[in-house]
Structure formats: structure tokens, C-alpha cells
Amino acid sequence: MGIKGLTKVLAEHAPRAAVQRRVEDYRGRVIAVDASLSIYQFLIVVGRKGSELLTNEAGEVTRQETSLALPVSDHCIPAYLTFHLCELCSHLQGMLNRTVRMLEAGIKPVFVFDGEPPEMKKKELAKRSLKRDDATKDLNRAIEIGDEDAVEKFSKRTVKVTRKHNDDCKRLLRLMGVPVVEAPGEAEAQCAALCENHQVYAVASEDMDSLTFGARRFLRHLTDLGYKKSPVTEFDVSKVLEELGLTMDQFIDLCILSGCDYCENIKGIGGQRALKLIRQHGCIEEVLQNLNQTRFSVPEDWPYQEVRTLFKEPNVSAGISDFTWTSPDTEGLMGFLSTENSFSPDRVTKAVEKIKAARDRYSPGRLKHLTPVASLPGTHTGKEPKCILGSPGQSLKLINYCSSSSTSNAGYRYTVDLSLLAFKGLIS
């Protein structure tokens, strides 16, 4: 979620703190990327062409197949299956494509993954889980009545980034030769710490709380490469403070008062009113002292002081060395993407060629200021867990689906791997 209403507040009250940039402006720059948020976006932004990744060179699915009947409305099931078919590999497709495009632009990405969430965020995570449960119920109803648009909408609302998604992307990035950081806590906080320590030039994310954690430069839309034409928006935290007329401590209080992931906000106080109150009173303590208690109800035991400490002293690793971008592991990528995840071998080969070409084009000899000195350790180990989808089923690995000319309105027939499919109540 980030900080409620902060984008609008900055657009109105600190317009000069944000500038529009081209991707090319970051050529030669080391950028910390919030990986976990990117993966969520990859899972949400799913198109039909994502299913191409599950086929071989002849367009055929290579897994063991069998068939089953799904006794639901004919015209809505393709939307549901298409979404989850693409979802199975969309995190890998998105991570591969966007990382390649960043490397081709001369950007040196460092992907930072979430660790253990702070205790104060667990209430927000529980709320999100309940929303996914509600979306699953809505999805079931949409399937029953055959509402194709609703099936697609509610399918996306059931999406959750799993450990499997994260582990897959870490493995992919390491095979690509791109550094990975596993944060002990919030990825945004670790990104901000790397930026504050001058180990990276900027932080790329969509959550505005990167600024609250103290990132000197914050980039939005950088990971939209190849999907949107939006320019990159760069925020400079020093200009944010200057334009708003606040200290960093006051800015943190503004963000807490506006609403964040770590505590409830005061109902009726959004970003605009929060800015006015902080400018008038200077800190949350004084705001509460002068707040109209009959108009605004402060949550009981409101932990704003603990949240303030979390933003100022987050759980981050201070012992991270500088980074090295290595040559891609061609054999490893082919095995992981093509053999294990049914990517087209030609697609993998082209991606490797692009990575190598970008590495040659922006070699340390040409960009001397980027010469790294040490690499982050870590290799992928352990048995892969199944991908758990927020759907009427549990673990699911769709292989292919096709309509049968002899199938009646009672349902479609689809070719799937039954051993990994669990549509509760939907399999006849």
C-alpha cells in the first residue's frame, strides 16, 4: 500500500521535487529494485501470450497429460484458466524481460527481496488475507454464473506472492548474473539503506514509503519497461522536504498521520489534512493535543511512536558488500527456464544473447565508475515447493486447455496434469 495520498500531496505541494526522466538517463547507474513488489505486479499484469512460455518449439505442451471436465459455464472457464496458466510463469517471464531491458539500457540493477515482516505489519497482512478470501468467494460465484469479466477481475484479487515465486526469481537473477539481496526485514527499508550508504544511486519501487525510510532518490515506473510508455518519475527526498517545509522527522510523522502499512490512521485525516496539521503543530504529539476529539477518533493504543521508530531505525543489514554483475549461466538458464518451466529454448537463447551484448556494451572498461569489487554469496538450494494460488483450488499446475466439439453446455474439457490440480468442488 505504501503511504496513503502521498503522491497527490507531493504533486500539489512539492511539484519541483519530482522530475520526469528517460530510462536512458540512468545508464551506468546502480539501482536497488524492490523485487517483491515487482513480482506482485508481474502476477497481476497477465496477458494471454504468457501461456506461450509453457509450450515447446512446436507449440505443444511437454508435460504428461490427461483430461477432465469442469462442469461450469463454457465461456467463463477459459478466462479463469488463462489467467492462472499465465500466472504460473508470469513472475519468471516478467523478471526475465524487465531485467534484460534494464541491462540493455545500461542500468545495473540490484534486486532486494523482503525478509520477515515487522510485527506491526502483520495486522495489515491479515487484512489482505481476508480480502483474498472474500475475492475467492466472489470468484466462485462468478464462475457459477458464467461472468467472464468478473472471473478475470476476482482472479487477480486472489493473487499472493509465495515463497516459491520469490525463490524462483532469486534463482533466475543469479543465473542471469544479477546481484540479489535478501533483506532481514522490509525490502523498501533495505533499498533505502543501500541508497543512504551510497551503494546504489536510487531506489526503484512503486511504494512511496521508500521516501519515508529515507531513500535519497526514489524512482517510479522504472520497472514498467516494455509494458508502459510512462516516463520514469524521480523524487529527490531533500527537495521533498524543502518544498514541503518539513524536517525528515516531520515528514515521517506526516506519512504516519496520512496512513501507512504499520498502523491504522485517524479516520477523516488524509494526506492533505495531515500536511496542514503537521505544518501547524510540528509533530504528532502536538497534533493529538490540539485535535478535535469529537470530530476525529484516534485509534485506541495508537502505536505511532513505535511506527516512527520503525521508519527511523528499520531492520536492515549493514554488512552488505559492493556488487558484481557476472556473465549469465547459459546452461543453467536453459535448464531452469526451458527444461523445468517450459520456456521456448529460442526465447532463452535470445535473452542470454541480449544479456551478453549489454554486458559487452557497458563493460567496466567503458564505465569505469561501475567496477564492482565483491559479490553477494548465495545459490539456490533445496526442493522446490509448489506454487500456492489463491483460487478455488490449492496447488495447481495447468498444462494446457482446449474445448471439445462434443462438449455440451455442462462444461469444457481441458488437458491438464491431474496430479497437481485441485479444483475443490469443480471437478466432475
From Swiss-Prot:
SUPFAM superfamilies noted in UniProt: 5' to 3' exonuclease, C-terminal subdomain, PIN domain-like
PTM remark: Phosphorylated. Phosphorylation upon DNA damage induces relocalization to the nuclear plasma.
Cofactor details (free text): Binds 2 magnesium ions per subunit. They probably participate in the reaction catalyzed by the enzyme. May bind an additional third magnesium ion after substrate binding.
Positions annotated to bind DNA: R98, E186, G259, D261
Chain positions covered by the region annotation I-domain: 150-281
Listed cofactors: Mg(2+)
Ligand binding (Mg(2+) 2): D207, D209, D261
InterPro entries for this protein: 5-3_exonuclease_C_sf, Flap_endonuc, HhH2, PIN-like_dom_sf, XPG-I_dom, XPG/Rad2, XPG_CS, XPG_DNA_repair_N
Intracellular or extracellular location(s): Nucleus, Nucleolus; Nucleus, Nucleoplasm; Mitochondrion
Keywords, comma-separated and alphabetical: DNA damage, DNA repair, DNA replication, Endonuclease, Exonuclease, Hydrolase, Magnesium, Metal-binding, Mitochondrion, Nuclease, Nucleus, Phosphoprotein
GO biological process: base-excision repair; DNA replication, removal of RNA primer
Binding site for Mg(2+) 1: D34, D114, E186, E188
Entry GO MF terms: 5'-3' exonuclease activity; 5'-flap endonuclease activity; DNA binding; magnesium ion binding
Keyword Secreted listed: no
Function in brief: Structure-specific nuclease with 5'-flap endonuclease and 5'-3' exonuclease activities involved in DNA replication and repair. During DNA replication, cleaves the 5'-overhanging flap structure that is generated by displacement synthesis when DNA polymerase encounters the 5'-end of a downstream Okazaki fragment. It enters the flap from the 5'-end and then tracks to cleave the flap base, leaving a nick for ligation. Also involved in the long patch base excision repair (LP-BER) pathway, by cleaving within the apurinic/apyrimidinic (AP) site-terminated flap.
Binding partners and assembly: Interacts with PCNA. Three molecules of FEN1 bind to one PCNA trimer with each molecule binding to one PCNA monomer. PCNA stimulates the nuclease activity without altering cleavage specificity.
Official protein name in the record: Flap endonuclease 1-B
Organism: Sorghum bicolor
